[in-house]
Amino acid sequence: MSDTFQRIAPEQVRQLRENGAQVVDIRDPQSFAVGHISGSRHIDNHSVADFIAAADLDAPLVVVCYHGNSSQSAAAYFIQQGFSDVYSLDGGFELWRSVYPADTSSGEAE
């Protein structure tokens, strides 16, 4: 089990997603509704405990925020909670949207 997360580029996130990684978006609900990485899950302080309880701690987890800053703190938190393979998207959703505009969705979290 690793005790640190890795910062990765959008291209690496795309590859991890193709191999079944879970992507979580920690931005505010309004920003998530306007646009997010297709297939990502919105989590916040109210839903994080349920997410952790149901998650596969050994599966790769990618954390996304606005620009890649807040996701680093959240990634470190997930490591502390027992996740073994955690990544932070460098550049955040803003960079993802500029690199992969067709691989974004809109709508509220389920």
UniProtKB/Swiss-Prot annotation:
It catalyses: thiosulfate + hydrogen cyanide = thiocyanate + sulfite + 2 H(+); thiosulfate + [thioredoxin]-dithiol = [thioredoxin]-disulfide + hydrogen sulfide + sulfite + 2 H(+). Pfam families: Rhodanese (PF00581). Coiled coil: none annotated. GO terms for biological process: glycerol metabolic process. Its EC number is 2.8.1.1. GO terms for molecular function: thiosulfate-cyanide sulfurtransferase activity. Keywords: Cytoplasm, Transferase. The active site is at residue 65. InterPro entries: GlpE_sulfurtransferase (IPR050229), Rhodanese-like_dom (IPR001763), Rhodanese-like_dom_sf (IPR036873), Thiosulf_sulfurTrfase (IPR023695). Belongs to the GlpE family. Transferase that catalyzes the transfer of sulfur from thiosulfate to thiophilic acceptors such as cyanide or dithiols. May function in a CysM-independent thiosulfate assimilation pathway by catalyzing the conversion of thiosulfate to sulfite, which can then be used for L-cysteine biosynthesis. This is Thiosulfate sulfurtransferase GlpE. It comes from Pseudomonas aeruginosa (strain ATCC 15692 / DSM 22644 / CIP 104116 / JCM 14847 / LMG 12228 / 1C / PRS 101 / PAO1).
